[in-house]
Amino acid sequence: MIPLTSELVAIGKTATDKADAIAQAVDLLTAAGKIDPRYGQSMMGREAVANTFLGNGIAIPHGLPQDRDLIHDTAIAVVQLPAGVEWAPGDTARLVVAIAAKSDEHLQVLSNLTDVLGDEAEAERLATTLDAAVIVARLTGAAAPVAAPAETPADFAQGIDVVVTGAHGLHARPATTLVDLAKGFAAEIRIRNGAKVANGKSLISLLNLGAAQGAALRISAEGADATAALAAIAAAFEAGLEDEEDTGAAAPEAATPGLTGAGASMASYEGRTLVGISSSPGYALAPVFRFARDEVVFDTDAADAAFETDRLDTALQTAWHELEELHDEVWKTSGPARAAIFRAHQEFLHDPEMVAEAKALIGQGRSAGFAWHRVFSDRADMLGAMKDAVLSGRAIDLRDAGQRVLQHLGRVRTGETHLPTAPCILLADDLTPSDTARLDPALVRGLATAQGGPTSHTSIIARALDIPAVAGVGPRLLDLATGTPVLLDGGAGVIVVAPTEADKARAETAMAALTAQRELEARERYKPALTVDGARVEVVANISDVAEAIASVEAGAEGVGLLRTEFLFVNREAPPGEDEQLAIYAAMLSALNGLPIIIRTLDVGGDKEIPYLRMPVEQNPFLGERGIRFCLSHEDLFRTQLRAIYRASAGGQVRIMFPMIAMIEELETARRIAEEVRLEVGAAPVEIGIMIEIPSAVMMAPELAKRVDFFSIGTNDLTQYALAMDRMHPVLAKQADGLHPAVLRLIDSTVRAAEAARIWVGACGGIAGDPVGAAVLSGLGVRELSVSIPAVAGIKAQLRHSAMAENRDLARRALACTTAAEVRGLK
């Protein structure tokens, strides 16, 4: 307890402003020999980054932790201001309690102050008394209330024990973190420190505990999500409760890039926040630029139908060639998967019904521009209104392709500059593939869209270009005017409007830390992912072509966990032959130089179409002829691919994987065909596995495991099939989270079935490359994580700094959660 005498209490003072009030308190402390006068500057420095107004007319100015060497002797000084002084907008301080504490001796003073915060009459008495002894007695605890104390609430039945580790106890900042966390759960939470019990959702109540370093707290909870709440709180205490005075200046996000869930970050930012979905991690500070497409105007009518028809044909042909050039450019810079969308756009331009309908309108006296605009707009509107999310999502592609033709049929009327010419954060309702292909990463520091989700085209491009991005922010995003300064936190899915200097400093610190972290990860990328307690997790890469095979090795991948062979079949007029496929597989094996590769057989259907294969139009393509079903119904393609794979297997460690297995019969048929092909080419046996991405496969996993060498869990499809949510859906994308407990329980069942059959389990998909997901999956027993190439080094580093025992405990607690948000709150 800090001794307080009347000499350090100034009664009946006035102050012109907050700085004057603090200066008077500093004078008292300096005159008493308690501090160096420069500590006053530290107190003002604290005010620049935090509000020290407690409430009920009481403020507690104190210095920054790095300036404690300016404190000679721990002390407090009180300046009474009966007339008050504005401390912050809307807050008037009448009792200024200046604290100069070397450690946690001041906690009892804070505890006594919290009693006053809940008693307006007592606060008024202290702000107007003419006797300094009254204030001294109240702050030192000598004037305890006379009334009999109320009965202390009992602990709830379910609880945990934690210890306060912070050097300065449970002071305001860590207590605020704890309150914010507790409020995220419906359960009632109580925290006991000896005889005192606090409401875990009340800052005042928590401060009243007076919990110093080393205090043993009993935390109990009651309610439907009590187990999850206690698990999250235990993890928060273990992590230090975001106490900057003990953990240093680095922002929490710098340690875990890629986390979605904006709650923790929002609580830390002072500026107004807009919340969306994390699309690409990282930070950006820049003015916004509102993306606007050029407007094309055209005449409604035209007299010469033949001339207008020729204009339409020429515009269609010109647009087709533009798309061809754009396809080739994107292929070179971003790979075939990114370029494939432009082939689809070319198909729109060849649609015979659209062209015929437009020409019919021209024959009725309409201009080519009017006719084409009417036709593609009507069809886009029809697509956008469809209930099927895949089809409705095509509307933006059709409008993009249609607009490309239209610009050759009318006059371009430019409003805003089409693309930015200075560094900015680009805002848009959504971006088409054509838009994103033209972005200059040197100027676009960040991306934010009102629509979309983490698997939208914009998000995929942002990650490929390493641009921080937030999607699905909503219409209010577009209320921001060009030039508005913002901070974009891609990992948290947050945009901070007009960030304060403290927000900017925090982001700049985090950016510097993130850069340093990535540089360290890059230097250590070839180290194995061996946990601190000796468990090995292999981190491999998802690839689509030879260039990515080379890049995966350079990135530190320990092999390829998923080769998407679809890229061999797209952007061409006929399927590749056996020798062509063999040459490509052999080139990949050469690039991997002995590292293993899992080759997934052709996986088309659903949202992956190949025009020349004449795939049937299905009402529900995701529930139709997908994956292995397509291969079994096109056995000639399947056998050709298997022959190429088996022939290539002589040159390296090849494993074969069948996609979208739903039933035992599918697997047995696929294995029979594969064995027939192997014997035909005279190849040695290779490991054969299946993807677990359909709930029926999970339920049949014990039987399936007896028939394969490994499982690979496709978390993206498993999530959408388990939750009945298309991960591309503009509304449901936010909820289609692979860390939902329902999905995790399916994964847990799969792993246990595999372990019983003594086969290994890998995972690919979004959560394998997510920091929380990697920890949970490894804790569940997944032994191989296949991630995007840019994520390899970071996931390996994270696993090297973790303990498998802790990951198993995290996984156990995650399985007990009821929502994805609870799971993400565990770590």
Swiss-Prot record:
Mg(2+) binds at E693, D717. Its cofactor is Mg(2+). The active site is at H62, H171, H457, C764. Its EC number is 2.7.3.9. The modification Phosphohistidine is found at H62, H171, H457. Signal peptide: none annotated. One of its GO terms (cellular component) is cytoplasm. Keywords: Cytoplasm, Kinase, Magnesium, Metal-binding, Phosphoprotein, Phosphotransferase system, Sugar transport, Transferase, Transport. One of its GO terms (biological process) is phosphoenolpyruvate-dependent sugar phosphotransferase system. Coiled coil: none annotated. Residues 2-142 form the PTS EIIA type-2 domain. The keyword Magnesium applies. One of its GO terms (molecular function) is kinase activity. Phosphoenolpyruvate binds at R564, R600, N716, D717, R727. Belongs to the PEP-utilizing enzyme family. The phosphoenolpyruvate-dependent sugar phosphotransferase system (sugar PTS), a major carbohydrate active transport system, catalyzes the phosphorylation of incoming sugar substrates concomitantly with their translocation across the cell membrane. The enzyme II FruAB PTS system is involved in fructose transport. NCBIfam families: PTS_HPr_family, PTS_I_fam. This is Multiphosphoryl transfer protein. It comes from Rhodobacter capsulatus (Rhodopseudomonas capsulata). The lineage of its organism: Bacteria, Pseudomonadati, Pseudomonadota, Alphaproteobacteria, Rhodobacterales.
